[in-house]
Amino acid sequence: MKNTFILGIEGTAWNLSAAIVTETEIIAEVTETYKPTAGGIHPREAAQHHAKYAASVIKRLLAEAKEKGVKPSDIDGIAFSQGPGLGPCLRTVATAARMLSISLGIPLIGVNHCIAHIEIGIWRTPAMDPVVLYVSGANSQVISYMGGRYRVFGETLDIGLGNALDKFARGANLPHPGGPKIEAYAKNATKYIHLPYVIKGMDLSFSGLSTAASEALKKAPLEDVCYSYQETAFAMVVEVAERALAHTGKKEVLLAGGVGANTRLREMLNDMCEARGAKFYVPEKRFMGDNGTMIAYTGLLMYKSGNTLSLEDSRVNPSYRTDDVKVTWIQEEKMKRVPEISPGTSLKLGELLDNGAEAIVYLEEGPEGKKILVKERVPKAYRYKEIDERIRTERNRTEARLMSESRRHGVSTPIIYDVEDFKLKMQYIDGVPIKYLVTPELSEKVGELVGKLHSAGIVHGDLTTSNILLAGERLYLLDFGLAYYDKGLEARGVDVHVLFQTFESTHRNHEALIEAFKKGYRRTFIDSEDVLTRVEEIKKRARYA
């Protein structure tokens, strides 16, 4: 059988890179990297760099391929990074791809840059159906495949982790790229400095962390600030990845994107996966940053599934979302799925009910033989001890206080019996998380519950279908560790956005679920329309920048 040969061109930002691949082999790859004289990336200068070197990169690539017996006439398609990325750079690369397509008389394939990072990781590791932590300059996302798309479980609400690191590095007068310099300085630190740790459900925010780190430089050594920045930011993304693992029930984590070259981040992810019994995969470093091979290989998958473009449809998209892409090359029946459960499952005292991202949950016997649920926030080996103890203590107290307060406002929650430093004892409710059986009717009831919560001035902070329990005809809200008091539109909007993101990433009927939620939310919360409008604004904000 004849091999399929695809030529791919990457050029979303810094790197102009082209490669030729088959299903099993990288034939050749040539890269020219834009290096600004000072500061960060200048989109127009980067595009000029790509235009200057495009012809020579392709010429060198074809020459290397010829040495391996691959002629231009053997190439079956031209793949290019269609987005997301910097508009001027994308347009330059698309022009080069169109010219090659016309001259060779072969189809074009428009590749999503983010998905290419995922597919190269799956190709170059044993990963089959992973939760993906994708961290690059402009992107920070937790992603997994479901129902014909790569779904985004959580992402940055402001700035990508790589750009946040670079921004801090520039303020500290460190040369570009900032990430490796921060990593090097962090190795010589002697002290951890308290910095803000911001997680909103499965979403993240890095802007406040960067500002606080820059302020800390006025009083603390650079080494200590770099170390503290890394430990805090990386713990945040690892926790969000663990939350996605717990929610989906998947057993693999794949690290993708340029920030993934950081040794400490890899170490933390490996520690988290070992503790959960999950497998951790990361491709070799040459495939972590932007490269032509990932575009070529993803283009090959798309080509073989009949996914090509006409010239008229080859316009670039600087804001091309991961979850906008119809994934035509994955066979659904081969993917692992979370086993469903049903009410009435027999549970034994002391048996582990749940190993969540926050805590382990088990039963113990209370007075008169009554079952009591124990939620214990165990140490996380991947987190620096001071961060870990602070988070566990704060969340334990917050959960006890706001869960009880929510009950007083008509929101069904378990009754808290006792509070210890890292442990809660509460009413055991024999129910099922709605992630296994959510319907539009249930979603409408969820909307009513959240409306009552917001009317009381409480923001849950972690609204997912894993944290809502159905017992009989009643819904219970669980896991208030990230909850807080806030009557602002932004806080309430993020709260609802997190839930909608869970619907979209996990449930095939997400559109019906969202509309049903809105109906119930409007019924119990007077300012619902303002919040729902803000949700749309937040959704647009969480885009490639």
From Swiss-Prot:
The protein's annotated catalytic reaction(s) are: L-seryl-[protein] + ATP = O-phospho-L-seryl-[protein] + ADP + H(+); L-threonyl-[protein] + ATP = O-phospho-L-threonyl-[protein] + ADP + H(+); L-threonylcarbamoyladenylate + adenosine(37) in tRNA = N(6)-L-threonylcarbamoyladenosine(37) in tRNA + AMP + H(+)
Any idea where the Protein kinase domain is?
340-545
Q: Tell me the leader sequence span.
A: none
GO MF, any single term? iron ion binding
Which superkingdom, per the lineage? Archaea
Q: Which CDD domains match?
A: ASKHA_NBD_Kae1_arch_bac (cd24131)
Tell me the cofactor note: Binds 1 Fe(2+) ion per subunit.
Q: Which GO terms describe its cellular component?
A: cytoplasm; EKC/KEOPS complex
A GO BP term here is: tRNA threonylcarbamoyladenosine modification
Q: Where does Fe cation bind?
A: 113, 117, 134, 290
- The record places the active site at 462
The entry's L-threonylcarbamoyladenylate-binding residues are: 134-138, 166, 179, 183, 262
Q: Does the keyword Glycoprotein apply?
A: no
Enzyme Commission number(s) from the entry: 2.3.1.234, 2.7.11.1
| Localization per Swiss-Prot or TrEMBL | Cytoplasm
The record's top EC class is transferase
For activity, the cofactor(s) needed are:
Fe(2+)
Keyword annotations of the record: Acyltransferase, ATP-binding, Cytoplasm, Iron, Kinase, Metal-binding, Multifunctional enzyme, Nucleotide-binding, Serine/threonine-protein kinase, Transferase, tRNA processing
Q: Which Pfam families match?
A: RIO1, TsaD
Which intervals of the chain are annotated as region Kae1? Answer: 1-329
Instruction: Name the major location.
Output: cytoplasm
Q: Keyword Nucleotide-binding on this protein?
A: yes
Q: Name the family.
A: In the N-terminal section; belongs to the KAE1 / TsaD family.
Complex and partners: Component of the KEOPS complex that consists of Kae1, Bud32, Cgi121 and Pcc1; the whole complex dimerizes.
Name of the protein in its database record: Probable bifunctional tRNA threonylcarbamoyladenosine biosynthesis protein
Organismal lineage: Archaea, Methanobacteriati, Methanobacteriota, Stenosarchaea group, Methanomicrobia
